[in-house]
Amino acid sequence: MSKVVYVSHDGTRRELDVADGVSLMQAAVSNGIYDIVGDCGGSASCATCHVYVNEAFTDKVPAANEREIGMLECVTAELKPNSRLCCQIIMTPELDGIVVDVPDRQW
């Protein structure tokens, strides 16, 4: 298990233990992180799991594929260089301690 910290737009921090192989979206939805919706169930087709990856981890997270990049263009919150869909971030030991900021809206 590795740690993930979700920081809500209001500054609330939730730390979760997440098993390797589980997406950050799955972990969030399963543990009541209500700011992350995940309507599509993890297929990168809805952009309701948009997060900002902490800069200390941007190089550790695999690059976004074309599908994810296309969906990121649809997000309603500000698009930043560290914007990602957390359904596409799969937990690995290298990501232990990752911090993601959740924007103020997913719609």
Swiss-Prot record:
InterPro entries: 2Fe-2S_ferredoxin-like_sf, 2Fe-2S_ferredoxin-type, Adrenodoxin-like, Adrenodoxin_Fe-S_BS, Beta-grasp_dom_sf. It holds the Pfam family Fer2. The keyword Transport applies. One of its GO terms (cellular component) is cytosol. Residues 2-106 form the 2Fe-2S ferredoxin-type domain. CDD domains: fer2. The keyword Iron applies. It comes from the Bacteria. Binds 1 [2Fe-2S] cluster. Keywords: 2Fe-2S, Electron transport, Iron, Iron-sulfur, Metal-binding, Transport. GO terms for molecular function: 2 iron, 2 sulfur cluster binding; electron transfer activity; metal ion binding. Monomer. The oxidation of camphor by cytochrome P450-CAM requires the participation of a flavoprotein, putidaredoxin reductase, and an iron-sulfur protein, putidaredoxin, to mediate the transfer of electrons from NADH to P450 for oxygen activation. Belongs to the adrenodoxin/putidaredoxin family. This is Putidaredoxin.
